[in-house]
Amino acid sequence: VAQTLVFAASRLISTLIVNAAAQDRKINSVPKTKRRTGFVSIAGRPNAGKSTLLNALVGEKIAITAYQAQTTRTSFQGVLTTPEAQIIFIDTPGIHKSDSLLNKRMMDTVRGALQDRDLILYVTDATRPVTEEDEQAVSALNKSVKAVLVLNKIDKVEDKRLLLPLIQRYTELFPFAESVPVSAAKAQGLDQLKAVIASYLPEGDLIFPEDYITDQPLRFMAAEIVREAILRNVREEVPHATAILVDTWEETKRLFKIAATIHVERQGQKIILIGNKGEMLKKIGTTARLRLEELLQRKVFLSLFVAVKPNWREDPSFLNTVDWRTMLGSESKAEEKP
């Protein structure tokens, strides 16, 4: 039995490599005046590594990542342009139970992102068995759109034979067109995945300029970077109870002056974020400022404030005032895209 599994696993990997090569040839056969161009939604359970995968595929850090679930709250685009294709990725929040008004709106975003796409990438953690929550998440996929199963984190799977029953179970749940094992964190299998994706896209003209990376305004990126700094420095429930509002944005030739308010639900959360003598807020600010300077390629003066807005995740008026899709004020104007 063991020998049979080893042989099957070997055949699986060999087949994937051969298929990727064939798809590469198929892509390269497209006339250079045309490219394969289309929209690809990235879906999956929380903590499957969707945002890490998006960053790895695009080659830039445009989505926040952390070791906690539900770090992505909105769907947004990352664009990969190669000589053969232009792929517009739509990252989405993790598919999960909608237990708050904010989460219900997030799931509305997911459902919208799974409609009218050229392809869906369903990303799963290859180290985890299929659970009831996974089955429910897969059932949310649109069967009228082709989907590729992406088995992420394979660098953590020592026995690759374990991938076979995982693939089999997922293909029983949904008619996935293909299965591709990758490690987004280790950049393994990404070229193969890009070839697979492009092979399903139609020929067409470029939708965005070749140097275009994301559709998100700089204010959104700043708010997300602050939220990621909170996620990386503060544990437990506090990060998920935060909404970031960029209050002011001033730009000169030498620096950016940015002020943002971190909204939390309880006084205790505010105390945790500020920390002893303001040390935690200072740490969060430093983490965010360094990342912002990397993004903006300029000095950044960042001011952070913490305010209590009780039960904001269930407050429709607050969610409407503070655009829940971007965590920015409704009066904010979009800046030039990076």
Language-model region placement:
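Conserved, well-folded catalytic cores of nucleic-acid-processing
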Residues: E60, V79-P83, S98, A113, ...
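Conserved C-terminal guanine-recognition region of P-loop GTPase G domains, centered on the G4
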Residues: D108-A177, T252
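Residue-level signature of catalytic and energy-coupling elements of molecular machines
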Residues: A43, N47, L53, F76, ...
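Conserved G1/Walker A P-loop phosphate-binding module
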Residues: V30-D108, G112-L114
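Intrinsic, low-complexity polybasic segments
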Residues: Q3-T4
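Conserved glycine(s) of the Walker
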Residues: G49, G189, M280
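Canonical P-loop GTPase G-domain recognition
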Residues: K146, D155-T214
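P-loop NTP-binding site
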Residues: L218-P338
